[in-house]
Amino acid sequence: MDRPVTKRITVLTLQNIYREKGKIAALTCYDATFAAVLENAGVDILLVGDSLGNVIQGQASTLPVTLDEMIYHVCCVERGTHSVFILADMPFGTFQVSPQEAFRNAVRLMAAGAQMVKVEGGRHMAETIEFLTCRGIPVCAHIGLIPQSVHQLGGYKIQGKTPDGARQLLEDALLLQKAGAAMLVMELIPAALGEEITRSLSIPTIGIGAGAVCSGQVLVLHDMLGISSGTLPRFVKNFMAGADSIQVAVRNYVKAVKTGEFPAHEHMF
């Protein structure tokens, strides 16, 4: 059933879902038309992701995406919605130089309509996250596979497979929570590690290839609809298969996340 138009979901709403042991359903979104469809289908969070570099611009990575481009797409998504929560990626190069520069750039994303910004990186981003949160900007941290560091990581590979790697990611998560992160995205890590981190934190975790115990799930919209070029990653399910409309496919995704049916074993590492 479509969600009736109501006041916008807030950080407190997401925290209440988390405290009540509910699941948070998120999808990427880049324009007003899809934003309205996803909102009406019951998605909780629209992530205006720098993945637009891949699926909208045809880039080989997210690295070329600029702040102005992110602001444009945040504005588009905000105009198409009334109640869904809007999370925006801080693109490569906009938050790494200094906390002060990160704040200036985050302010522009918030002014465009974002309710929270997402920052990729581990413990080295704790100072920046604390700086932002102390100045009124909610932050979602992002650990595991961080696409903006794909060259440093040597490609799109599972992270945290070794005991040392797993321990570092758990420590990173705890440090970022302590710094003030209100939410944590975990990407491409073993399901057992995703569960350990989720149970160790008191903030929601959103998984993408991080197992089923996370507080919620996110997928790239184009992947979930089966319209991305190339082979879909293992952690993706094509919800368009068997659905007679995009609206139905998205509703099926939301239901599968909320009931714990997705991700299934075949989508985990």
Curated annotation (Swiss-Prot):
This is 3-methyl-2-oxobutanoate hydroxymethyltransferase. Homodecamer; pentamer of dimers. The active site is at residue 187. SUPFAM superfamilies: Phosphoenolpyruvate/pyruvate domain (SSF51621). InterPro entries: Pantoate_hydroxy_MeTrfase, Pyrv/PenolPyrv_kinase-like_dom, Pyrv_kinase-like_dom_sf. Keywords: Cytoplasm, Magnesium, Metal-binding, Pantothenate biosynthesis, Transferase. Binds 1 Mg(2+) ion per subunit. GO terms for biological process: pantothenate biosynthetic process.
